[in-house]
Amino acid sequence: MTTGFLQKIFGSRNQRLVKQYQKTVATINALETQIEKLTDDQLRGKTGEFRQRIAAGESLDKLLPEAFAVCREASRRVLKMRHFDVQMIGGMVLHYGKIAEMRTGEGKTLVATLAAYLNALAGRGVHVVTVNDYLAQRDAEWMGRLYNFLGLSVGINLSGMEHDQKQAAYAADITYGTNNEFGFDYLRDNMVYETDARVQRPLNFAVVDEVDSILIDEARTPLIISGQAEDHTELYVRMNALPPLLERQIGEEKADGTGVEKPGDYTLDEKGRQVFLTESGHEKAERMLAEWGLIGDGESLYAPQNITLMHHVYAALRAHTLFHRDQHYVVQNGEVIIVDEFTGRLMPGRRWSDGLHQAVEAKEHVKIQSENQTLASITFQNYFRMYAKLSGMTGTADTEAYEFNEIYGLETVVIPTNRPPKRIDKQDQIYKTAKERYDAVIRDIRECYERGQPVLVGTTSIENSELLSHLLKQAGLPHEVLNAKQHAREAAIVAEAGRPKRVTIATNMAGRGTDIVLGGNVEKQAAFIEADEAIPADEKARRIQQLHDEWETLHEQVKTAGGLHIIGTERHESRRIDNQLRGRAGRQGDPGSSRFYLSLEDPLLRIFAGDRVRAIMDRLKMPEGEAIEAGIVTRSIESAQRKVEARNFDIRKQLLEYDDVSNDQRKVIYQQRNELLEAHDIAETIGAMRHGVISEVVRQFVPAGSIEEQWDLPELEETLRNDWQLDLAIQEMVNESSSINADEILDAVTTAADEHYEAKVALVGRESFSAFERSIMLQTLDRLWREHLAALDHLRQGIHLRGYAQKNPKQEYKREAFELFAAMLDAVKQEVTRIVMNVQIQSPEQLEEAAEQIEEQGGQLGNVEFQHADFAAAAAASAGGAVVADATAEMVGHAMSHSGPAGEVPRVGRNDPCPCGSGKKYKHCHGKLS
């Protein structure tokens, strides 16, 4: 109450920030007449002048008013678009490293040019991040005209580009690309063997378009580069026969033995999207597997040798019970293609991990592709936090403002609209059944159609969009369907969605990033005519002119009919997705309206709010076909959505806390890789490793400070001869000297090892041997890091069970992950020293052959894939608690095939705390390796 009172007096933080930025806008506007007088060459010359001033020490903040004024004027001349004052505020918000929430149609693409131009002047690169290749290419070409006019270079970073094209794209002042591609390039850069094979520069400044989609919706799904692992095709086929033999149990058994309405073999947790075998289910599964010869008679699924079978059983169960065709995936050309749960788009090439995709392929009887082994991975949360400055834009960020601030340290600023919004958001209507709801939707669509008002109908799945399409056909209402299956026609459908009497059905936010213009998008329609080679040139000109002539009439006709009407056929789990759907109407002060039609059979209501709403309907004795339209019900639904949002936030936060452990270790490994790549000679590092390893070997047989009776010299001699190629008569040495001690024996062995090493170097030359050492070091580090990632995944899967032993799973995970990491670094030292000491060479050519053989034995895996995949079963484990276990199946991920790397990792000072979490100084912990 006090806060509200103070806000009335002083205004909210958002209002104060906007007011502060408006003062800067006034300064920019005052410069406008002066900038307008400049010739094109003088305007272009301003870029060089700004760069000189930056080199002389002037800050970007001080340059901002003049740079923004120059960018606005250049845009007016080149693009025929002048930035509005509110767009200038948006540009400032981006420059100061915040998130700008701007309504649909307010020109976010143009806003990005202000911050991108100003920050590109420093010469350290700017990344503009979009959600798909189409938008990256469109924006780079469209806004590239403005940047090129001002003397800046623009690059496009697309999947499948050649290595030199990528290097050129990143070397440009401003680089457009997708979030996936930027992340994969970072991982690839940290897998290279030569410094000039990298493509990225240090990560400086990023402007993330649709920031909510990238930093929140996709935050739970890491980017993974993987290679093919062992083939289990036959096992997936056999396991696919199991789920149809099992029956679902209805109801959960309570402590007193009640609660089960119908006994069965497995239970479904719809809220957490999990499946669990019951006791009878385990027994039946074990019996069936024994019949098929997969386990021994009387053996348990939980026996150590059957743990992998358990994984396959659950993968098959999840595929049959939680993942449905035309909702979570489609089958096209003999492949299972994932449907993005947030946009409704198809994602060809992407795959679910943890065996789930193979289980779905077995279910659909298509070719089963091999499982993968992780080579490198990172989450978007940890990738984007590496930028020196991060900012973003979206139409809907305010509901997630807390998460942006908590996870990324980004403040959200709501930018005022250029014109007052005129959209009318009507109360939700709730029906008892889905049939009644669809009847009401058809009635509403018919009314709009008859008065010439365009309608956009939002659905939550392909299945629902096709059901509604079928109902509209029966009702005789012409319409277009915009879902993943019509991806190729998407732009054409969206371009005409604002014309009178147009009815468009869209899954989630298909078509996001493209405005629906009342009366139709003339530019888009004209572009389609221009691209059609079958139409003669004079006919093209006539048709385009006709389009422009018609548009004014159509635009006024649609405005009079009420503008674009949005119909939501279901509430999403997140209020933000609902707001995105509503936001398609009422752009730039146009009229518009929206309404959601719900039924008690919808998952959100059934799981979270159904009982309360059903009780209200029963109390009111609602007849069939009648709807509730009341604020109390809408608030009840929003409360349910808030619960889901809070739960999803907890999931993402928990996952981040677990991923931070591997992220800290990743920083150490990648920093050491970079140091190895950049070092001309690593003899000193190899020498320190050799001395450490030899010391450990000697101390096993001759402990420090021990007496002669405790020494095992024959065993030491044999170990040095067999494992380290050192033929030393240590027993003779001891017999000849009565006063020799343990330290002197160590010195003698170390000296012999150094001489053995120097003899190899002398044979082939320092330069050749140094290149060999670097190659061995990198290959060994990469191979053991891959194995370490697999070990971390394995650890994560079972760590939540520590909670039953009254231990904190998170602390246990950190402790064991640190122990695994320390063991991995020790293994690197042992392995590299062993190879260098044992390699037999007489010439530089033999040295190259040896390096190639070692690479073949333990080097890269073939068929590398780039995945945006889920933690799946690991997710439940990863969180060590109900929150993340609930969300295991929600972390549906995606996997992408691309070809061919990254920002430098922030340096860790020698005296700084080691990022692995041990509490030691870096030089005494993982800095020892470097």
Swiss-Prot record:
Keywords: ATP-binding, Cell inner membrane, Cell membrane, Cytoplasm, Membrane, Metal-binding, Nucleotide-binding, Protein transport, Translocase, Translocation, Transport, Zinc
EC number: 7.4.2.8
Domain of life: Bacteria
Record's cofactor remark: May bind 1 zinc ion per subunit.
Essential cofactor(s): Zn(2+)
Catalysed conversion reaction: ATP + H2O + cellular proteinSide 1 = ADP + phosphate + cellular proteinSide 2
A GO cellular component entry from the record: cell envelope Sec protein transport complex
Example of a GO biological process term: protein transport by the Sec complex
Binding positions (Zn(2+)): C914, C916, C925, H926
GO molecular function: ATP binding; metal ion binding; protein-exporting ATPase activity
Database matches in PROSITE patterns: SECA, SECA_MOTOR_DEAD
Membrane topology: Peripheral membrane protein
Binding residue positions for ATP: Q87, G105, E106, G107, K108, T109, D515
HAMAP family referenced in this protein's UniProt entry, alphabetically: SecA (MF_01382)
Complex and partners: Monomer and homodimer. Part of the essential Sec protein translocation apparatus which comprises SecA, SecYEG and auxiliary proteins SecDF-YajC and YidC.
Family, similarity comment: Belongs to the SecA family.
Protein name, UniProt field: Protein translocase subunit SecA
Record organism: Burkholderia thailandensis (strain ATCC 700388 / DSM 13276 / CCUG 48851 / CIP 106301 / E264)
